[in-house]
Structures are given as C-alpha cells and as structure tokens.
C-alpha cells in the first residue's frame, strides 16, 4: 500500500473518494465481460469443516446489472452457494481429497445462459512448533548445596540457583505420563532419599496433573494441558530421607503452558446492528464490531484482523463500506446512500487470528446489519393540483375535502408528517386543515357557519410542508401548493323574528280585542318561495292571540299590571313562525309588553289585626296602607274614621303621622276587653284618587305595667296550647318515676351486697380439706347464745381502719386481734342472726337434713365470745388411732382429706 508523505489525516477520506471515483470511471471505459473473472477459486481450510461455515466468495461479473443469476454447486450435498456468491458448507465433515475440488455453476434465469468455475480447497498445514523443544534427553535439576561442616572444615555455600521455567505446550498428544525433568540431590550418593512435589496441579486442585517418582525424582505430566484454563503451574520440590527428615530446602519449579492456536475468534454478538443517515459522506463512522480470542493475546494466536467478506445488496456500489482490520470500525467509503432505494445493508464480517493469515489463522464470521436512516430529502407533493368539496350552509365541524400528498421519506416521522395551511381564499377564517396522523391526508374542515345567500363558493389556496425543514443541499422546493374549490349548498333555514325580543309599552286595563302590534318573521332563504304562518307558543295569562297570516297580536283579556305573571312591569309572550319548506323550519320570537300603571287598586289597612290595652295609656296602634299600584297612584295616603256607626268616632281616634303611617288610639278612658272591628277610610294619591274602607281587628285586653296583655288568651295566642301543657306535665311525671325506680333499685342492690358478705365466696375458699355447703344441717343443739357476740367486728367500731380488699370471715386474721368490750347491744342489722335462724328453721322443717355430727363452716366471730366449744366438732374421738381408710371410698372430691387422715405419704 502506497502512502502519500505529509498528507494530513483529514484529507485521507477525500483522497479515498477521489481514488474510488477514478477507478469507477476507468471501469466504465474498460470492456466488461459477463461471467466469472477467475478460472479457479481456491481456499485454505482447517481439517474440520462445520455446518454453515462460510468457505469463500466467488465473484460474478454482471456488467449491465440486469441479469438475474442463480448459482448451483456440483456437490449440493456438501456445498451451497448464496445469491451473493458466498459458498457455505451444508454439513460438517473432515476435509479430504474427495472434497478438494468441485464446480460452481451460474445460470441466467431469463436467457438460460450458463457459466462455470472450479473451486479448489486445500488443507491448512500444521503450524511448526519451533518454540517447543522436544528432546529425548531429560533435563536434570539438582538441589543447591547447603552450608555445612565436612571433615571438620567449613564449606562455602553456592548461591541460590535460578531454575529456568519449564515450557510445556498445551494440547500435547503424549504419550502420558510424559517425562519433564529429573529432580536430584547430590546427597543421594550417601543417603537414601525420597522426592515429592507440592502445589496446584500436584497435591492441590487440580490434583494429579504432575507426578514424581519418589526414588528417581522423575517429574512427569499425566494429561494434556489447556493454557486457557491454567497458563502457569508453580510447584515446590522436596527431598527427605527415609525417616522423613528434610535433607534439602524446597526448590520452586515453574511450568509455563505454551499457547497453541486452538481457539477460533468469537464475536461478542453474532448479529450487529448499526445505523447511518442517508446521504452520508465517505468516511462517516457507522459502528464497531468486536471479536475475542481465548488464545494468548500477546502472541500471534490471539491477534485478530477483520475484513468484510460480502455486502448485500451491492447497489449502488458493492463496496459501500470498509472496516478497520485492527479495531473493527466500519465506515462508509462511497457516496450514494439513499434510504428510498436501499433501506438496509447486510455485511458478513470475518475475524481471523494469526494477524489475519489466511493460511494458518482461524476465522469466524458475524453479520452486521446497517440500517440507512431517513433524512428529510423529499418534500410532500399533492397528488392533484385541484381538490373539490361541498358543504351545506350553516354546518360546522364538517370535512369538505381530503387533501392527499405523497412523501418518499420514512412514514410516521417528522420528515414524512405533513403540515397544511391555507394561504389564500379564506379571509374570514371559516376553514381549517387538520392532518390525519395515519394517512397523512389534509382534512379541510368548516369551523365557522357559512351563509349560502352570502357566499356560494370558496376557492382556497393550500400549501403542504414537513414538520422539519428539508436537509441541506436538496434541490426541491420546501412545500407544495394546490387549490380547493368548496361549493356551498343551500338548505332551508329557520325563519327569524327581528327584533327579538320586541318591546312595546301599553297601559294596563286595555279591553279585549285591542290590537297591540304586528310581530312578523323574516325568511333568510331569499331564493325559495315559502310562506310563513304564526302560532302562539307561550302566553302565561292567556291575554293575547296572533293572526296566523299577518302576525297581528290582539288582546283577548284585560291586561293587569298587578298580575303574578307580570315581572318588573313586563309581560312576556312567545310566538312561533313556521315555513312550508322541505323540511319545514321554524323560529321563535318573544314579545315583551311593558305595562304602564293606572290607579285601579284601592289601598288596604296594614296590619289587619292589632291589640291594645283597656285604657288609652300606655300604648297605641301604628297602621299603614298597602296599595298594589305604584307611584303616583299609591301614597301618600289619607286615613280617617267613618261617621257611622257613631261609636267608632266616640271610642277611637286616628292621627296621621306622615304620608304612609297613622296612629289609632282609644278616645275613651276605658274599653272593656274584647275584639272590635274598626273601619278605616284610606285614600291614595291617584288621579282620580281611590278610597277604600278597610277593617282593622283590634283586640282589647288587660295589660301590666309594661303594656303587655296578661290574660290566658295571650298564652294561647303565643302558641302554647292545652295539649302542649299536658304533654310537658306527663314528661315531668315520667321522669320522676324513673328517678324513684332507680333509687329503689340502688337501695335493694346495697342490701343484697351486705347479705352476700355473710356468705363465703366459693372462689375465695381455697382450702382443700373443707367443702362449703349451702345447707348446714340441724345446727347447734344448744340454742342459748348471745347474738351480740355474733356481730361482725366492723360493725362494732365503724371508725376503725379496715384492710384493703375482702376479708374472709371463716379464718383468723393474721394481724393482732383487737379486744372488743362485751356489751349487750341490740343485734345489728348486718349481723348473721337472721341467717342462723333461717338455717335452723330449714333444718327443723326438712327431715332429710344431715345429722348434727356433720362438718359445719362458721364465720370468724371475733374474740370475747361467750359460746363454748363446738360440740359437733368434738363429738367424735380425737385419737389418732382411728381408721380413716373409708375416706378413700368417697371419690375424688375427698381425695385430699383421705390423704391427710388416711396415712398417705404426702
């Protein structure tokens, strides 16, 4: 390869492109011959050929590029040829002389013209192992002599030997065990020695690889070694006498495993993916492929070189890419990448060790798929110069036309997506264009209503461009233009009233049959001959009617401003106008009648009921007037009393306070309590004025000093009736009964609690030798006892300090017993006298009561009791010689008692 001295590295891609252009130009001038350019294709292979292994590439010259050639092998069972001329192994086989030569046929599918070429395969020779020294002579390693005494003289020790490592090639074929070296001590002449080796590969994992003859010291290897597993072994040799005493210091032996080219390069990925933009210049980086070799990377066995075996497709040039043979970087070397023509390239990449030596190196292949990415080098183009559409008038959100464009760029990318805009013909903005994201079409849509009577047709100028600008250097205009002709279709429109609403002013009180106004509608369809008829749609008070032909509105009742259907002096009525088109359409209009007030309502007294005291002092009645008319037909008002009956003016007097209020007072000093109806004449200020006699109901009652009524009727009038009073009393009685029942229940519970304190709680009786019974039999025969001695000690001195908790009454307290004076006091309500009497009564009346000699339970009764010893407990002999074995027959409940008195062990 020649090199231009002094050329900067930045000019190398340019020089490569110029060189390629010159080569292509010269190739076009030279005469092209269709067929195989070589007579024989040869390849050097290893002995074992694997299935699918690429062997070589046969080139076929297709001058015009239009021939469709089909390849065929003369040995189809062993070899096949791909469309790009790459020869593959169909099956795995060892390479021999029968596979050394075969033919490749190429045939034109259209003309049936046929060509052939010979292929010769040769076996790769075995790499000579000059570095491995195989000698029949076994090297001897002697232990270095130590410092010691010999014949009474000191001898000088030699310096430590530097024992060179032993080089052993991997994958040796033996025979095994294979002798490596002999280890010997110079003392073996005088002593019987034993030799051994230690370390990984000997007595440590992996064990058994190296062995030594203990007598001769011969070190041997027992199996082939693999450098990729262990590249170096470090052993130590030992020499001892027959008693196991160390004779020599251990020496180190290093065994290096020499690498052989026994591993093919392996790509990190079998398929590599990369991208390159279309239109990229030569020298553009694409991707990097990487392979690894398990052999020694510092030797030729692990030094890899890359190359491109094939490129598919081969357009526009069969060498669009190149690869750096050392780094694996793939770059472009030719111009003309066009995604619209070729979207993807497939490269077969080969990695070979031995620095790429095709004779001795091992190879492997991988696939590099390079995708040509899109750039915006094609603007959108309309498929037609003019598009047509139509739309009914007054319709919005209607698609009137679909604008179609073509774009050769990659679909659904910013370089393909079209953006439409209206550049002319729509000054009022009645149309808009949206892009269909799936089809990329432009949808012309009406966004504002269109009136046929105003515009019958629109001619729009539209433009389309991509979302991103065109790439630099593209010789196309950035946008495409077209026209859209939109026809407006006339439809039957609704009639409309004008003005709407229509407001008129009329006085109230107009008689029926009065013509108010003419309320007509207009038909916007000027080019349609249609008639309009009118009907009443809404008339809350039913005061109006409309002529169906001319729209005259006439009253059918008297208009009253004070009607509840009149709001803020305005009465609303709605009318409907319908045409006879197809389909018929209608419109509504509202007539608002502003009613002017007239003095047609007499004033009334307010309030209509009042109360006052029997005497003129201390209060009066304030009154006013209510008039449904408005000014000037309302206040100020004039208040007066009628002349008859005569007692009205005799008993009452009225005083005007201002134009709206007056005050009614008693004229006499006393008026009997009761209800009186006082007529009052009220006159408004209308023209002419309107008067009215209004009745005021006055309640005269007895009053207190504050002027408030004090009779019962006032309570009733306040809203508290007899039923409510009875209900309140019943609730109070029920509440008192509940409180009383609760008090009784609490007292009864306290009494029961005091009675239960006299009994022994079964849970508190933890003694195993005494059982508590509810019935105590006949009790004591001696009935002469003092009940005062049976009172509880707590009842004698209530102020005494009581211990915390519940004290058992049937056991002696553990603290010092207080001395209580003997006194004949009346039995305390809390004593147990009643309890004993009830027990005696039950025993006398019950013939089945237990005998007197039964076990009884007594509560602790305090000291100072006058009662003697309990005869029922002393009736039996207290001697210890009695037989208590019968207690064992009483069952498990008496087991503890039987153990205590029956002479048990425990």
Curated annotation (Swiss-Prot):
Name its GO BP terms in alphabetical order.
adherens junction organization; calcium-dependent cell-cell adhesion via plasma membrane cell adhesion molecules; cell migration; cell morphogenesis; cell-cell adhesion; cell-cell adhesion mediated by cadherin; cell-cell junction assembly; glial cell differentiation
Q: What is its main location?
A: membrane
Keyword Membrane assigned to the entry: answer is yes
What residue range is the signal peptide? 1-25
Subunit organization = Homodimer (via extracellular region). Can also form heterodimers with other cadherins (via extracellular region). Dimerization occurs in trans, i.e. with a cadherin chain from another cell. Interacts with CDCP1. Interacts with PCDH8; this complex may also include TAOK2. The interaction with PCDH8 may lead to internalization through TAOK2/p38 MAPK pathway. Identified in a complex containing FGFR4, NCAM1, CDH2, PLCG1, FRS2, SRC, SHC1, GAP43 and CTTN. May interact with OBSCN (via protein kinase domain 2). Interacts with FBXO45.
Coiled-coil-forming residues are none
Protein name, entry field: Cadherin-2
Q: Which CDD domains match?
A: Cadherin_repeat
Q: What are the protein's UniProt keywords? A: Calcium, Cell adhesion, Cell junction, Cell membrane, Cleavage on pair of basic residues, Glycoprotein, Membrane, Metal-binding, Phosphoprotein, Repeat, Signal, Transmembrane, Transmembrane helix
Q: Which InterPro entries match?
A: Cadherin, Cadherin-like_dom, Cadherin-like_sf, Cadherin_CS, Cadherin_pro_dom, Cadherin_Y-type_LIR, Catenin-bd_sf
| Chain positions recorded as Ca(2+) 3 binding sites | 261, 263, 293, 301, 353
Q: Which GO terms describe its cellular component?
A: adherens junction; apical part of cell; catenin complex; cell junction; cell surface; cell-cell junction; cytoplasm; desmosome
The UniProt entry, under PROSITE patterns, shows: CADHERIN_1, CADHERIN_2
Compartment(s) of residence: Cell membrane; Cell membrane, Sarcolemma; Cell junction; Cell surface
**Known PANTHER family for this protein?**
CADHERIN-2, CADHERIN-23
**Low complexity bias (residue ranges):** 863-880
- Binding residues for Ca(2+) 1, per the UniProt record? 170, 226, 228, 262
Region: Disordered, residue numbers:
863-884
| Removed propeptide positions | 26-159
| Known glycosylation sites | 190, 273, 325, 402, 572, 622, 651, 692
Q: Which organism is it from?
A: Callithrix jacchus (White-tufted-ear marmoset)
Q: Which Pfam families would you find in this protein's record?
A: CADH_Y-type_LIR (PF01049), Cadherin (PF00028), Cadherin_pro (PF08758)
Q: What is known of its domains?
A: Three calcium ions are usually bound at the interface of each cadherin domain and rigidify the connections, imparting a strong curvature to the full-length ectodomain. Calcium-binding sites are occupied sequentially in the order of site 3, then site 2 and site 1.
């Amino acid at each position: 390869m020649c090199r231009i001295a002094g050329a900067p590295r930045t000019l190398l891609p340019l020089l490569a492109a110029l060189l390629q252009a010159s080569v292509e130009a010269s190739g076009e001038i030279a005469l092209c011959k269709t067929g195989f350019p070589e007579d024989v294709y040869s390849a050097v292979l290893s002995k074992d050929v694997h299935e699918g292994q690429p062997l070589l590439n046969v080139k076929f010259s297709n001058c015009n590029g239009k021939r469709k050639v089909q390849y065929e092998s003369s040995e189809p069972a062993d070899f096949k040829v791909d469309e790009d001329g790459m020869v593959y192994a169909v099956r795995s086989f060892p390479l021999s002389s029968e596979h050394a030569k075969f033919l490749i046929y190429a045939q034109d599918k259209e003309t049936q013209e046929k060509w052939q070429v010979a292929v010769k395969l040769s076996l790769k020779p075995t790499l000579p192992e000059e570095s491995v020294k195989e000698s029949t002579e076994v090297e001897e390693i002697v232990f270095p002599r130590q410092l010691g005494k010999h014949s009474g003289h000191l001898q000088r020790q030699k310096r430590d030997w530097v024992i060179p490592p032993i080089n052993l090639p991997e994958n040796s074929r033996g025979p095994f065990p294979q002798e490596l070296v002999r280890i010997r001590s110079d003392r073996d002449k005088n002593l019987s020695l034993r030799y051994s080796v230690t370390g990984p590969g000997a007595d440590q994992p992996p064990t058994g690889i190296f062995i030594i003859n203990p007598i001769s010291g011969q070190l041997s290897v027992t199996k082939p070694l693999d450098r990729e597993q262990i590249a170096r072994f470090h052993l130590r040799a030992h020499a001892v006498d027959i008693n196991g005493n160390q004779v020599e210091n251990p020496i180190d032996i290093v065994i290096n495993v020499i690498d052989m080219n026994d591993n093919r390069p392996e790509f990190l990925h079998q398929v590599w993916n990369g991208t390159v933009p279309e239109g990229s210049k030569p020298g553009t980086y694409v991707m990097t492929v990487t392979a690894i070799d398990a052999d020694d990377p510092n030797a030729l066995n692990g030094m890899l070189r890359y190359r491109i075996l094939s490129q598919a497709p081969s357009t526009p040039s069969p060498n669009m890419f190149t690869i750096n043979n050392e780094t694996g970087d793939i770059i472009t070397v030719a111009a003309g990448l066009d995604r619209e023509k070729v979207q993807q390239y497939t490269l077969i990449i080969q990695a070979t060790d031995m620095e790429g030596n095709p004779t001795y190196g091992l190879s492997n292949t991988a696939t590099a798929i390079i995708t040509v990415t899109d750039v915006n080098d094609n603007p959108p183009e309309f498929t037609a110069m003019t598009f047509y559409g139509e739309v009914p008038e007054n319709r919005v959100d209607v698609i009137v036309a679909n604008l179609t464009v073509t774009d050769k760029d990659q679909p659904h990318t910013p370089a393909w997506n079209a953006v439409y805009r209206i550049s002319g013909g729509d000054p009022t903005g009645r149309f808009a264009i949206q892009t269909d994201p799936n089809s990329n079409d432009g949808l012309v849509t009406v966004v504002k209503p269109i009136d046929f009577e105003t515009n019958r047709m629109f001619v729009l100028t539209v433009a389309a461009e991509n979302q991103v600008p065109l790439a630099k250097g593209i010789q196309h205009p950035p946008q495409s233009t077209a026209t859209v002709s939109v026809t407006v279709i006339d439809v039957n429109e609704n009639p409309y009233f004008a003005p709407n609403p229509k407001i008129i002013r009329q006085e109230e009180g107009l008689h029926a049959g009065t013509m108010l106004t003419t309320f007509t509608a207009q038909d916007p369809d000027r080019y349609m001959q249609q008639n309009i008829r009118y009907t009443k749609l809404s008339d809350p008070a039913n005061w109006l009617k409309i002529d169906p032909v001319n729209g005259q509105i006439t009253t059918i009742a008297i208009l009253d401003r004070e009607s509840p259907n009149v709001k803020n002096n305005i009465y609303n009525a709605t009318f409907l106008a319908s045409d006879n088109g197809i389909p018929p359409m209608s419109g509504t209009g509202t007539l608002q009648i502003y009613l002017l007030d007239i003095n047609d309502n007499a004033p009334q007294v307010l309030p209509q009921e009042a109360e006052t005291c029997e005497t003129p002092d201390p209060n009066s009645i304030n009154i006013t007037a209510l008039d449904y008319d408005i000014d000037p037909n309302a206040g100020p008002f004039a208040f007066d009393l009628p002349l008859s009956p005569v007692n009205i003016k005799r008993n009452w007097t009225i005083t005007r306070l201002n134009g709206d209020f007056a005050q009614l007072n008693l004229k006499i000093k006393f008026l009997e309590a009761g209800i009186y109806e006082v007529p009052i004449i009220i006159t408004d200020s209308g023209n002419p004025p309107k008067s009215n006699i209004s009745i005021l109901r006055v309640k005269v009652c007895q009053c207190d000093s504050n002027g408030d009524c004090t009779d019962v009727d006032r309570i009733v009038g306040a809203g508290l009736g007899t039923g409510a009073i009875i209900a309140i009393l019943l609730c109070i009685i029920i509440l008192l009964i509940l409180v009383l029942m609760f008090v009784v229940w609490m007292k009864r519970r306290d009494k029961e609690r005091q009675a239960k304190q006299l009994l022994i709680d079964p849970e508190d009786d933890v003694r195993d030798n005494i059982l508590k019974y509810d019935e105590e039999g006949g009790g004591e025969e001696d009935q002469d006892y003092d009940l005062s001695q049976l009172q509880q000690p707590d009842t004698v001195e209530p102020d005494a300090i009581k211990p915390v908790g519940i004290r058992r009454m049937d056991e002696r307290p553990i603290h010092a017993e207080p001395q209580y004076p003997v006194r004949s006091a009346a039995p305390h309500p809390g004593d147990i006298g009643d309890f004993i009497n009830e027990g005696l009564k039950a025993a006398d009346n019950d013939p089945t009561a237990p005998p007197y000699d039964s076990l009884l339970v007594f509560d602790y009764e305090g000291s100072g009791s006058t009662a003697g010893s309990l005869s029922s407990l002393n009736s039996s002999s207290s001697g210890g010689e009695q037989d208590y074995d019968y207690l064992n027959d009483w069952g498990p409940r008496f087991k503890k008692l039987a153990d205590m008195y029956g002479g048990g062990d425990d």
